[in-house]
Amino acid sequence: MSQDCMRCMVWGLTFFLLILGPGLAWAGRTVNPPPSIVMDVGQEKPVPQAMAAPYAFKTDTLDWAYGVAAGGSGYIQDQAGIFGAVMGSSNSSKGIYLVGWNIQMPFWRRVFVDYNLSWGDYAKQRIYIDGNPGYTNETAGGNDSNSSDFLEGSGEDNWAEARFRYVFPWGAASESPINRYRLKKGILASKPSGGKAWNPLTSGVTILEARAFWRERTLQLGEAQPINKTNGLELSLIYNNTDFPTNPSQGSIQRLGLTRDFGLWDSSQTWTTVEAEASKFFTLRQDGKWFKQSVLALNVWTIDTPSWEEVDGLNESRPPPYLGPTLGGFWRMRGYPMGRFNDKSAIYYCAEWRVIPQWQPLPKISWLRFFKIDWWQFVGFAEAGRVADDWSLGELHSDMKWDMGVGLRLMAIKAVVRLDVAYSEEGVGVWAMVGHPF
C-alpha cells in the first residue's frame, strides 16, 4: 500500500469519527459530557468550525466503505454542533446519518437537545439470537454460548433518538448551564468543574436526561425476514463531578437509569431495564519529565430487566438482543464482537491506565495539522464482565469473561479520538471511536 493511500485511509477514518462520533456514541455510551465550550489559553472567544470532505475505510462487515461527511459547530450556538454523512460500500451497503448535540432551547436555557437519525441498508449484519440450526439446544448470547451461535444476513438498521437534558442550577452550573474550559496543549489550565469534593450543591454538574428512542432492525434469512422494532423512553440522573469531562483526570461520575418500551405503535414487545454506573479517576504521581498526565480510571456498570419473564419456554418482555444487558463492542468488553453477550442481567468492570507523554511528534506531520492534535495518549486496560438469567451477585461474579488491551488516543479538534485493541479467549477486537469508553 502506498504512503499516499495510507494517508487517505487514516485521514478519512479520523474525519468520519469526528463527524459521526457524537451520534455513534449513543449506541452504547451511557454518560456523555455536559454541555461545554472548550478553548485554548489566550483565546478570547470560540471560533466556529466547518468541515466537509470525502472519507474511506475498510471493515469486515462493510468491506470498503466510502462517502462524504460535512457539518459544523459554533455557528448557531457556541456549544452546539450538527453533522451528517452519506455512505456506500463495495458490498452494496449504504446509509445516511444526521446528528446534532447541545442545542440550547431558546426559552429555557437549562434545557439542551441532542438528536440522532439514521437509515442504513447493510449487506452483512450479525445478531446473537436463537435460530442457528447448529445450536438448537443452546441459548445464543448467553455467558456459556458458543461464539459461532449467531444469525447473519442482510437487512436494515434504522433509528431515531431525541435526548433532552436539564442542567440543574447548582454546583459548577449554578451560574451558567454551560461550563467553559481553557486548555494549554490539551491539558486543563482553567478552574476545574469538579473533582475535589463530592457535593452536588457545590461541585460538579448534575443532569436529568430524557431520551425518546425508536429503532427498527431487519435480518434477511432466505425467505424469512425477522423484524425487531422498539421505541420508548429512557430517564437518567447523572452527577458528573470531574475536573474536565472530556478527558477527566480526577473526580467521579454516577448514573442511575430507567428505560421502558411501553409497547406503543409498532413495538415488538414491552420491556423495562434499570441500571447503575459509577466511574472514578485518580491522578497518579508524576515527575513531569516523561509524562504530562497519568491517570487511573475505574468503571463499574450493572443492569437488570425486571420485566423479563419466561412464557412457554420463550423469553418475553425483554429488550432486543442489541440493547439493554449486552456486552461486547465499542464500550464494554472490547475483546468480543458487538453484542456478543446478552441476557436478563449484566455486570461489568474496567480499569484503564491513561498516560500522555511529554514527547509529541504529531504536530510536525504536515498532513495531520488539519486535526489540530494537542496530545496523544497511550492506554492499557483490563475488563471483566458477565451476563446472566438473573441478577445475583454470586452468579454474576462466577465464570466471568475477561479481556485486556491497549489503546492509542488523540485530542483532535478538542475531541478525544481512540483506537483500542483488545484480546480475549475468542479473538482480538479492534475499535475506533470518539470519546473515552467512560
Regions found by a protein language model. Give the residues of each.
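Outer-membrane beta-barrel transmembrane domain signature
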Residues: 352-364, 369-404
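Outer-membrane beta-barrel "beta-signal"
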Residues: 164, 168, 406-412, 427-438
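C-terminal outer-membrane beta-barrel translocator/porin domains of Gram-negative envelope proteins
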Residues: 233-238, 242-371
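Outer-membrane beta-barrel initiation region
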Residues: 26-128, 149-154, 161-165, 174-177, ...
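Flexible, surface-exposed loop regions and adjacent strand-edge segments
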Residues: 130-137, 181-182, 223-229, 271-275, ...
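Transmembrane beta-strands of outer-membrane beta-barrel proteins
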Residues: 50-52, 80-85, 110-116, 206-210, ...
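Cleavable N-terminal export/targeting peptides
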Residues: 1-38
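Short glycine-rich beta-strand segments
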Residues: 120-122, 210-217, 257-264, 301-307, ...
